[in-house]
């Protein structure tokens, strides 16, 4: 669905969130895959403080530990811009302040799976997807955990944190930071139902 009229020239986030929430997953995914770099930048800036995110936005509270939840993504890079981030709760059900995940994408053979931990960010309402943290466990069907400094992952994941902001119930937008500095890399995620 084409919703650029709700983004350009200035994002109307309340209306955009309402429409995204009313769409089914296929239409929501089609919509976010149409958003270009300029629109992702606008949305990220506009989403500052708009919808407070919690870990439940990435893995709903009714999911058991080690059950995968898929978020489809589109980034602002010129190539390899469709991917998935797959999330789960830790095996220890009492550990409620962290999620685990990895990047499922076509060039994982070269970069590795890009494992990360997910925590609430220092800024209220934001979530950090942190590639600097070591993930100690994973669902059995996920790829082997390898350090993010192995393979070409050292150029992609090592030292990186994705700072996430909320747009709607299923859609969030992020910007990558490396070594504390913002990168010119944005992406949008859409959670599967």
Describe the residue ranges of each PLM region.
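Soluble ligand-binding/transfer domains with enclosed cavities or grooves
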Residues: 1-193
């Amino acid at each position: 669905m084409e919703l650029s009229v709700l983004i350009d020239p200035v994002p109307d986030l309340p209306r955009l969130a309402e429409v995204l929430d009313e769409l089914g997953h296929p239409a929501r995914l089609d919509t976010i895959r149409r958003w270009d770099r300029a629109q992702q930048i606008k949305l990220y800036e506009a989403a500052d403080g708009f919808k407070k995110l919690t870990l439940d936005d990435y893995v709903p509270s009714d999911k058991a530990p080690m059950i995968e939840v898929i978020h489809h993504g589109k980034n602002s890079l010129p190539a390899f811009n469709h991917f998935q981030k797959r999330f789960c709760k830790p095996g220890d059900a009492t550990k409620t302040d962290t999620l685990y995940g990895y990047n499922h994408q076509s060039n994982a053979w070269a970069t590795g799976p890009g494992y990360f931990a997910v925590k609430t960010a220092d800024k209220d309402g934001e979530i950090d997807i942190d590639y600097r943290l070591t993930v100690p466990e994973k669902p059995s069907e996920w790829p082997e955990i390898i350090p993010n400094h192995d393979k070409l992952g050292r150029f992609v994941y090592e030292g990186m944190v994705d700072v996430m902001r909320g747009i709607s119930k299923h859609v969030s937008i992020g910007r990558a930071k490396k070594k504390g500095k913002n990168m010119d890399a944005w992406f949008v995620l859409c959670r599967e139902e």
